[in-house]
Structures are given as structure tokens and as C-alpha cells.
Curated annotation (Swiss-Prot):
Protein name as annotated: Large ribosomal subunit protein uL13
Keyword Ribosomal protein listed: yes
Family: Belongs to the universal ribosomal protein uL13 family.
Primary role: This protein is one of the early assembly proteins of the 50S ribosomal subunit, although it is not seen to bind rRNA by itself. It is important during the early stages of 50S assembly.
A single GO BP: negative regulation of translation
UniProt cross-references to InterPro entries, sorted A to Z: Ribosomal_uL13 (IPR005822), Ribosomal_uL13_bac-type (IPR005823), Ribosomal_uL13_CS (IPR023563), Ribosomal_uL13_sf (IPR036899)
Gene Ontology annotations for the cellular component aspect, listed alphabetically: cytosolic large ribosomal subunit
Pfam (any one): Ribosomal_L13
SUPFAM superfamilies registered for this protein in UniProt: Ribosomal protein L13
Subunit and interaction comment: Part of the 50S ribosomal subunit.
GO molecular function: mRNA binding; structural constituent of ribosome
Keyword set, alphabetical order: Ribonucleoprotein, Ribosomal protein
Length: 144
């Protein structure tokens, strides 16, 4: 029996909608990372981008456990001396709630060239509406 390798012409992608309302951030992010990588499919090939497009709505209503709402800090650096910037979770939730899910999922992807293509299939929106209705996305029931 030979090992199956998926070809680029065999890739079939779906559009899925995930509702983030009252979901725990890390548990939701792991499921989204699995979907956009394509690991839930029997035709998964590590060297191919065979995952689905995922639309996340209600990102402003995501939950974190424990005291992370007060303690969690996001870091970025401008590559200039003294250029470390810190943003608290509460501030990020007020200004850019969609970035919280984006950074959580991006941190769960491998650090390689393929991950830059994979993360582009994640679309996160703070409210309930999204501009991807023409793709006729299916509702994905979050496990757990």
C-alpha cells in the first residue's frame, strides 16, 4: 500500500462560519487552526495547503478563563532600539477584538512558508455580519 499524497488539482475547499459567542479563546482557536490547515480531512498532506476557509463572527464576545482578562499582554516590536510595544487584553478587546482570535490561531500554526498562505484563509469579524455571503458558507458547530 502506497502513502497517499494530495495533488493541488484535488484540493476542495469549503467556506465555514464559526460563531465565537461565549466560546473560550484557546479551545476555539485550536479547532479553527485544524480547519484552516485541513487536518480534519482524510486527504491531509503536510506539504500542501488543503484547508478550508473559516469565517469567525462575534469575535467581540469571546471568553478567556481565569484572570487572563487582566493579566494577558500582547507584545510587538518595531525593530528599532527600545521599540517594544505592549497592549493589554482589555485594550485590545476594545480597539481590535478580531486580532485576539487572529493572533491565537496564528500562534498555533507552524512557523514556515506555508503558514503565511494558511492564515490568509482565516476571516475574523467583531460583529455578526460578514461580507462573504456569496460563498454560501456552512455553519460549523464548535465541539465542546
Amino acid at each position: 500500500m502506497k502513502t497517499y499524497s494530495q495533488k493541488a488539482s484535488e484540493i476542495q475547499r469549503e467556506w465555514l462560519v464559526v460563531d465565537a459567542q461565549n466560546q473560550v479563546l484557546g479551545r476555539l482557536a485550536t479547532q479553527i487552526a485544524t480547519l484552516i490547515r485541513g487536518k480534519h480531512k482524510p486527504t491531509y498532506t503536510p506539504s500542501m495547503d488543503g484547508g478550508d476557509f473559516v469565517i469567525v463572527v462575534n469575535a467581540e464576545k469571546i471568553r478567556v478563563t481565569g484572570d487572563k482578562a487582566n493579566q494577558k499582554i500582547y507584545y510587538r516590536h518595531s525593530n528599532f532600539p527600545g521599540g517594544l510595544k505592549r497592549t493589554a487584553y482589555k485594550v485590545m478587546m476594545q480597539t481590535h477584538p478580531e486580532r485576539i482570535i487572529y493572533f491565537a490561531v496564528k500562534g498555533m500554526l507552524p512557523r514556515n512558508r506555508l503558514s503565511r498562505h494558511i492564515i490568509k484563509k482565516l476571516k475574523v469579524y467583531a460583529g455578526e455580519s460578514h461580507p462573504h455571503a456569496s460563498q454560501s458558507p456552512k455553519v460549523y458547530a464548535v465541539k465542546g
